[in-house]
A protein has these predicted regions:
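Sec-dependent bacterial lipoprotein signal peptides
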Residues: 1-17
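Cystatin/cathelin-like cysteine-protease inhibitor module
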Residues: 17-116
Length: 116
């Protein structure tokens, strides 16, 4: 019985590490494509991946309209997915300033749906 718990624990750990990796890669690709000067962004550090049910269509619309400093204005986003979203915070250095953004991703962790 103890072996089963260990196997389940290891499987869950590996699955969560895989999700974190895919989320980080999706965010990095989004930043490279949509930052005004991605070469000026250094020392990227990611928090743990989380899920949220508290983001609805109207909040996503507001985040998309506002964007964030140092990012392009006319960013092309995917359609708003149904259900829970994942979020990932990225802390980074931009020209000596430490900044942070939160990115919201679809359930497949392939696309950034919105960010703030």
């Amino acid at each position: 019985m103890k072996r089963i718990y260990i196997i389940i624990g290891v499987a869950l750990l590996l699955a969560s590490c895989g999700k974190q990796y895919h989320a980080e890669k999706a965010v990095e690709a989004f930043v490279e494509a949509n930052a005004e000067a991605p070469e000026k962004i250094t020392h990227r550090d990611f928090a743990d991946l989380g899920t949220t049910r508290h983001i609805n269509d109207s909040l996503v619309t507001v985040m998309r309209q506002r964007g964030a400093e140092h990012y392009k204005r006319q960013i092309s986003y995917p359609t708003m997915p149904q259900g829970d979203l994942y979020y990932l915070r990225m802390r980074y250095v931009h020209e000596g300033d430490t900044l942070q953004n939160t990115f919201y991703l679809d359930q497949e962790l392939k696309e950034v749906v919105a960010f703030k």
